[in-house]
Design a protein with these regions (language model features):
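Alpha-helical scaffold/interaction cores of sigma-54-like transcription cofactors
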Residues: 1-357
């Protein structure tokens, strides 16, 4: 009551609606007529990239030609007609997909900051994950791994069925250079158009069940650990969780490994049974809820417009820097573009070791 000026902020019952006056009902109709559909969802808002060519895709193709000459030819891999056809067919296949999905700008941005820091003498990672399966990335020196040589598949990285979404090129830098990369992007595309992003920690599997057991004081600390340790780690069954309509680590354990948990809880005729059935039911209900927030370890958001006009901005928990106050999928849905810039300590150690030899 202190904060609200009315006690009617709820969905009324049928009987209550029948008591409304004709004027009230008419007013609702007038409000409805003044409302219009709109959406904040949009395609990726990539910043404009300066090019020497007439278009971004032509710039990309020219870089690929240069990569053929300067990267592929010195290896001797494209001397005979058979290999030339293999590499050309793969390049044309990838270019068709990239052009159709309008991703040339994305590749140009990544290639720009990767090669800029290589020119500065920074040890940049040779390639991480599915991006190493893209021959275009190799020709642009984004990655240093030839996917043809190692039999890596482009469609695992990106394919025409994913049109409208963005690829995911993770780039590794020494930790002491990561902030320099972000500063470079801010200076190039605008300080108000580049920032890091928020991520939420969630109660999943073991942590959800442990929280319920702790709050309810259902058992000793040792027994709590014994029970929760019988729940598999999320990463260990991630592929299986993707097959579930509503992914749940606890539900998966109850259905697929019931004997391990039978001492504490089991399911019978759709109902949970056992000494800890109530706690398991509560844990299932809270699984997936947010428990904490922090700054994403790798994600950097870049946009063609002022981020203050695109998404909520929040202060990071350990500092005064403003970061995007939404998670990756939500940011991409409203047009922000995420680049993964990781700090890998091993790269720093390798660089220092090479300098000492």
């Amino acid at each position: 009551i202190r904060y609200f000026k009315s006690n009617s902020y709820y969905i009324p019952s049928k009987e209550e609606v029948q008591t409304y006056s004709k004027e009230q009902i008419k007013a609702v109709g007038e409000i409805n007529e003044k409302c219009s559909d709109y959406t904040i969802l949009t395609s990726p808002r990539l910043p404009q990239v300066e090019t020497k060519s007439d278009s971004q895709i032509e710039e990309l193709k020219q870089i690929c030609r240069d990569g053929w000459k300067n990267i592929l030819m010195p290896t001797g891999k494209v001397k005979d007609a058979k290999n030339i056809k293999i590499y050309k067919d793969r390049i044309l296949q990838e270019l068709d997909v990239i052009e159709d999905a309008d991703l040339a700008g994305y590749f140009l941005i990544v290639a720009d900051y990767v090669n800029e820091f290589r020119r500065r003498g920074v040890l940049v990672g040779p390639g991480r994950g599915s991006a190493a399966g893209c021959l275009i990335s190799y020709l642009m020196a984004i990655t240093l791994i030839d996917p043809i040589e190692y039999g890596l598949i482009f469609s695992r990285f990106f394919n025409s069925a994913r049109k409208g979404s963005l690829p995911d090129i993770d780039i590794d830098f020494p930790p002491d250079q990561r902030e320099n990369v972000i500063t470079y992007l801010k200076e190039k595309y605008g300080h108000n158009r580049v920032c890091q992003m928020l991520t939420f920690g969630r109660l999943q599997g073991r942590s959800a069940l442990k929280e319920v057991l702790r709050v309810n004081e259902s058992c000793s600390f040792d027994q709590m650990n014994d029970i929760t340790n019988k729940i598999p780690q999320e990463a260990a069954i991630s592929d299986k969780l993707e097959e579930m309509d509503e992914p749940s680590v606890i539900r998966w354990a109850l259905e697929n490994d019931p004997d391990t948990l039978r001492e504490y809880c089991w399911e019978e005729d759709g109902e949970l049974q056992g000494d800890f059935a109530r706690e398991f039911a509560q844990a299932l209900r809270i699984e997936g809820t947010f428990k904490s927030q922090g700054k994403h370890a790798a994600g950097v958001v870049v946009s063609s417009i002022d981020l203050n006009n695109l998404c909520p901005m929040v202060k990071e928990t350990r500092g005064n820097e403003k970061i995007a106050g939404m998670e990756m999928n939500d940011l991409e849905a409203i047009g922000a573009v995420k680049f993964d810039i990781l700090g890998v300590n091993l790269l720093k150690k390798i660089h220092e070791t090479c300098g000492a030899v």
